[in-house]
């Protein structure tokens, strides 16, 4: 702002020099600032082109000029700038020296300058850096900032040192006494004991009397047999033998021969005589005979009887539907029919128990204690059920698992149809059961088996394992229409 005011003052001085071109030896003019107590002349309006927003008050206060000391021809230029009403206050004497304070002063030079905006000057050089200001007072502490987002998860810390060993816990409550174990099998015969120690040496006999040479005596009788030696101590227990190799699976048994034809059943009782049938309908009339040859003309006879009825005419059109007749009365109950022949329903069922615990793996389990097997379809020797009647069957098992895990599979048509397992160790006891419906054809076989190291099926005085199956309905009855 100060630079702009100085530039306007320089332009004003140059304009005044052009007006007074006749005086070649014009001294430098001097300006004095008007006192601040004087008001701005009425009608004096500064150019709006030099004002900025917020600076109008400053320009208004500095618009008044200093009082002249003497009159001069230069008054014309001052009057043309300030207006007609400014002549009473502002008068500039010719060639008088005055001073001008440009601080807060803006000169309106609209009448002496061109209205065309001048070109923008080049930016000035950057001034030197000013001295460092004094350190300001410490500001009041700011408000606490908002909580920042959660930082990334830190790296896993190093493993801590091992803690001290804790005190020994109190002893647990003694458990219930276990069930008595089964009697073990007879062990193998022990090795032959070592020879017992020799007996003590007998006392020395008395010296015999010296005699002459005698003849050789005969051979004496054999001495009595000595006493048996002491029984040797039992030998050390031999090492446990290794597990035998897996046996080969047996071939399927041959199909049994067809059974003999059963004896003919007893003849049924003769049925009662039926009721007399209703009277039959009348038969249709016969066709007329062929016409005979014409005979000789006879005498005129008497009027004969009417001739035969001619043949029936063609069938007429279908008549309209008649009205429905009334409902007839309920007929009387018929006579009871004769007793029919009884049909034999095919049957097949079995139920068997396991007699030894922990059956061998990967082979049919032999449930050899038969409870029911009238048709003989289940074989306790092979542990397999042989289907003789095709149809839909129901199979079930309920087994006890103890001491080791068990994996049970139900096999039908040489394929595992169902698999289940029980995980037990120690002396734990549990039960497993199954109910399954299967459709079988004649000759199909069904059995149960366990896997290696998963054969924990158990039987005992208080525990049983059972396998059962029966025919639900044969295939023939299922295919018949009602």
From Swiss-Prot:
Disulfide bonds: none annotated. Residues 343-478 form the C1q domain. One of its GO terms (biological process) is protein homooligomerization. Glycans are attached at residues 189, 315. Expressed in the organic matrix of otoconia (at protein level). Expressed in neonatal sensory epithelium of vestibular utricle and saccule and also in otoconia. Residues 120-344 are annotated as: Disordered. One of its GO terms (molecular function) is calcium ion binding. Residues 130-189, 217-276, 283-342 form the Collagen-like domain. GO terms for cellular component: collagen trimer; extracellular region. The modification Hydroxyproline is found at residues 141, 144, 174, 177, 180, 222, 234, 288, 306. PROSITE patterns: C1Q (PS50871). Residues 155-167, 236-284 have a biased composition (Basic and acidic residues). Not N-glycosylated. Residues 137-153 have a biased composition (Low complexity). SMART domains: C1Q. It comes from the Eukaryota. The modification 5-hydroxylysine is found at residues 189, 315. Residues 1-23 form the signal peptide. The C1q domain mediates calcium-binding. Collagen-like protein specifically expressed in the inner ear, which provides an organic scaffold for otoconia, a calcium carbonate structure in the saccule and utricle of the ear. Acts as a scaffold for biomineralization: sequesters calcium and forms interconnecting fibrils between otoconia that are incorporated into the calcium crystal structure. Together with OC90, modulates calcite crystal morphology and growth kinetics. Homooligomer; disulfide-linked; probably forms homotrimers. Interacts with OC90. Interacts with CBLN1. This is Otolin-1. It comes from Mus musculus.
